[in-house]
Regions:
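Core catalytic lobe of class I
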Residues: 1-289
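PRPP-dependent phosphoribosyltransferase catalytic core
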Residues: 288-322
Length: 322
């Protein structure tokens, strides 16, 4: 059970036996606490590999070696008022939010290699500020829009169910593998040529076609209570989403860095896919959750919606043999 503080009183969060949300007990906190890192002096390349740094981004990133990261994935606080485990972020004007981004973005650009790529997440409200800041330092290559599947209804506005991810690179020579992120889709109206399937395959489970990934993703499931990757982090990204970014923009063994690590999804997914990882997170509880998930990834490298070297549509577990 997870301890919850409500009006100064410790209470236990009661979960259903079917709830697979990852949480911590006191024994696990003691077990994983020694794995968390801090930085007080310049770090070597080896000292940032496969590490979780528990601290404020401004205090830690200045000690990272320059040009040390192959791929950076950033999921910063959006321009919304939200409580991240006791660390509150307050919504502000568009100009003030842009200034917030500009206060730390130059610091993280310093650690990117000359051939590195970067992805940064946002919603409709902050995406313009993200583009402006990123474009001042890097070359913006594309914008990915992904459908959250979840989303609260609205009476006086459109339901907000999509988010953006800006893709940028340091220079013109960057790594990108389109074949690594192909999607296996059902064929609704199969076309045949001379009686044979054209551009699709017929299997015992149905008719499927491998398609190249576009910049609109409608196959992502946001983590929820029945998924073991789920945590109590209020803005957790799906492992499947991060897996697409990692597979497309890094080689095996590359270093993937997340300066707003949260409960560890980027590091965990990088480890599952054979990459090195590093993250910075100021909330200790989230860092400990990340370490628990990383330990579990030693024996469980599965990623929901990704199997057989391809990404699958939602609700295809039977076809995947799961």
């Amino acid at each position: 059970m997870a301890a919850v503080v409500l009006s100064g009183i410790n209470m236990e969060k009661i979960r259903s036996p079917r709830n697979h949300t990852t949480e911590l007990n006191d024994g696990e906190r003691a077990l994983y606490a020694p794995k968390l890192c801090t930085a007080f002096q310049p770090l070597s390349q080896e000292e940032i590999i496969n590490r979780t740094y528990n601290g404020n981004l401004f205090d830690v990133i200045k000690f990272f070696p320059p040009e040390s990261v192959d791929l950076m994935i950033i999921d910063p606080p959006y321009n919304l008022s939200k409580n991240f485990g006791g660390n509150k972020f307050t919504a502000r004007s568009n100009d003030a939010y842009r200034e917030y981004l500009e206060s730390w973005f130059p610091l993280i650009v310093r650690v990117l290699k000359k051939n590195a790529s970067l992805y940064i997440c946002g919603d409709w409200k902050c995406t313009a500020a993200l583009y402006t800041v990123v474009n001042n330092f890097l070359t913006v290559r594309n914008r990915i829009t992904w459908q959250r599947e979840k989303g609260r209804g609205a009476v006086s506005n459109w339901k907000n169910s999509c988010e953006d991810i800006w893709f940028a690179t340091v220079g013109p020579d960057y790594y990108f593998d389109a074949d690594a992120v192909k999607q296996k889709r059902r064929v609704i109206a199969p076309y045949r040529e001379n009686g044979e399937p054209k551009d699709w395959k017929e299997t015992d489970d149905g008719k499927f076609r491998l398609t190249c990934a576009s910049n609109f993703w409608d196959d992502i499931t946001v983590p929820y209570w029945s998924m073991s990757e789920n945590t109590d982090h209020p803005a957790q990204k799906p492992e499947k989403l991060i897996a697409k970014l990692i597979l497309a923009s890094s080689k095996p063994g590359a270093l993937v860095f997340d300066p707003f690590l949260g409960s560890g999804t980027t590091s965990v997914t990088a480890k599952k896919l054979g990459r090195k990882y590093c993250g910075i997170e100021m909330n200790t509880e989230y860092c400990l959750l990340a370490e628990k998930r990383l330990a579990r990834a030693d024996c469980d490298k599965s990623i929901q919606g990704y199997s057989g070297g391809v990404f699958w549509e939602r609700n295809t577990g039977r076809e995947q043999g799961k």
